[in-house]
Amino acid sequence: LHSKHGSVPRAVPGITVGHEMVGIVAEVGSAVSNVKPGDRVTVNVETFCGECFFCKKGFVNNCTDQNGGWALGCRIDGGQAEYVRVPFADQGLNKIPDGVTDRQALLVGDVLATGFWAARISEITPEDTVLILGAGPTGICTLLCVMLHSPKRIIVCEKDASRLQFIRRHYPQVLTVQPEDCAAFVRAHSDHGGADVVLEVAGADSTFRLAWECARPNAVVTVVALYD
């Protein structure tokens, strides 16, 4: 949808979309050694060469190869088709263990990996109050990955009542709040005048502003969402 709305400048009109997928390897090129035909695999949303300056720094989304970064479903044909060619397959494909279903593995290629990376770079400590703005699929995956860091307190802000109910039912230890009450709620439930870490996963102008309103001085604010 971001591509359709014109919010992805590098998107190529007319390509086959689809960047979240699992599949079975049909063929491999001569340089591929990590997977073989018949392997069940996830496909990373980011393809990357592993050799350029940004790849070596870990910023694979900025891979300088023409088929690197967000290429699948954006600049080259993606996964909403019977077959898809995945560049840099040794880095871009991951074997799925036998005990993991396709449905479960599908999350690994994008939304869960996005949440994992966002939580990792947010420098979360056990003393922190962490605010997550947005409880859609990526927001919930971000919540799961934030929980791995065991912060003192997690607050989820979401306007949709059904999503808030989902959080309360499955994660009763997590505090929840609606956007109109968020800033005051965070101040009342934090130790230093605001959240120590804010992860913005909603992608709206209003939530981008709210992230900074809820952050304490010298907080970490991680922008996870894309914006139209």
Language model region names:
Residues 23-25, 38, 52, 84, ...:
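Buried hydrophobic positions in well-ordered alpha/beta secondary-structure cores of metabolic enzymes
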Residues 1-3, 34, 223-228:
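Short, intrinsically disordered, charge-balanced linker/junction segments flanking boundaries
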Residues 51-133:
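NAD(P)H dinucleotide-binding glycine-rich loop of Rossmann-like/cofactor-binding domains
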Residues 95-184:
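Mid-domain Rossmann-like dinucleotide-binding core that forms the NAD(H)/NADP(H) cofactor-binding site
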Residues 22, 42, 131, 155, ...:
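Structural detector of well-ordered beta-strand residues that form the stable sheet scaffold
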Residues 5-56, 97-99:
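Glycine-rich beta-strand-centered segment in the early N-terminal region that forms part
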Residues 122, 126, 147, 164-228:
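Glycine-rich cofactor phosphate-binding loops and adjacent beta1-alpha1 units
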